[in-house]
UniProtKB/Swiss-Prot annotation:
Location of the region described as Disordered in the Swiss-Prot/TrEMBL record: 271-294, 307-327
Biased composition (Polar residues): 313-327
Chief place where the protein resides: host cell
Protein name as it appears in the record: Movement protein
Species in which this protein is naturally found: Soil-borne wheat mosaic virus (strain United States/Nebraska/1981)
GO biological process: transport of virus in host, cell to cell
Compartment(s) of residence: Host cell wall; Host cytoplasm
GO cellular component terms, semicolon-separated: host cell cytoplasm; host cell wall
Function: Transports viral genome to neighboring plant cells directly through plasmosdesmata, without any budding. The movement protein allows efficient cell to cell propagation, by bypassing the host cell wall barrier.
Keyword Transport among UniProt keywords: yes
Domain of life: Viruses
Coiled-coil regions, chain positions: 252-311
Amino acid sequence: MGSQDVKGDSYESVYNKILDMQSEPGGANDLRTNRQRSFNIENRYVEKALTQPGVVTKMQDAWTNWTKTNKEEGTPYNMSYSCVLLNVIPTVPMGYAGTVEVSLLDSGLSPLENVIPDQTQMMELGKGPHVMCFFMHYSIPLNDKGRAVKLAFKIDAEMASKGMSVMNVYSYWTQRQGHLSAYSEPQRSTISKLMLGYDKSLKMKTRNDVRRFVGRSLSLHNQEQSVPALLPGQINVMKENVPLYRKESVIDLTREEREKAAQLEMLRKTREVHTQRSAEEMKRRQAELAKDTQRKLAEEAKAVTEKRKNMAGVNSSNIKFGNFDSV
């Protein structure tokens, strides 16, 4: 049957009704817009429709009733999904051995070829979070029974235990629907690795941060860095209200006496410095004298050696050897 112009008011009402149906709460296994989903390792292969099957059935019934009422039977109601974004966050440590393959499916196609061309991406779970983007360049009629656009997850993680989740998936997409069809040039799906930093909250910036943390489990009151002296060497118990660690020699001194004691202490230190310098000078002079003595002894020994050599040369020149032929 040929299509006819639809009535604005009636079409708008059914359009809003269909939109409201998609906002109805679904089951626990349904994947919806802005819905977090944790996929367990025990499900090696998972398919999740972008729109819940129960909602699609209600939408089909609402559209069929509207077309019959308005004598528009056969008029298609089209749905398309563009820019299906997935943030795949592994729940395993860095370097973990395992992969996940994500595809965008059209269940109306052949079971062996239901993956939309160029809409498959694979990531390694041990390389951190990735963002995937899938594109659907055409719309599908709501009239097709059992036809839906799905996300397929194929998980390969042999090292995980049974019932262990290996990733969390956050999804978002743009959906278009209405009596107008949609078709555009196809685009390849993309995958991007997220470059992340380090957790700032794990760093303790100052000693006070460490002190506050340790103070929650260890008493730090009345502690000091140096070793405290329990009692001094001598204690004059005859004097009252005097700190234990104050010097006994300056407790009862007057101001003049303290100044004189300070001057004497300064003279004593000066005398110690001069004495030390004199001792060092004496050591230096003794070292120089020892060097001179060694030098003189070496020169005398050398002179004696030269004298002996000269005497030996003079004596050898007076010796004559006889001739056996003259005898």
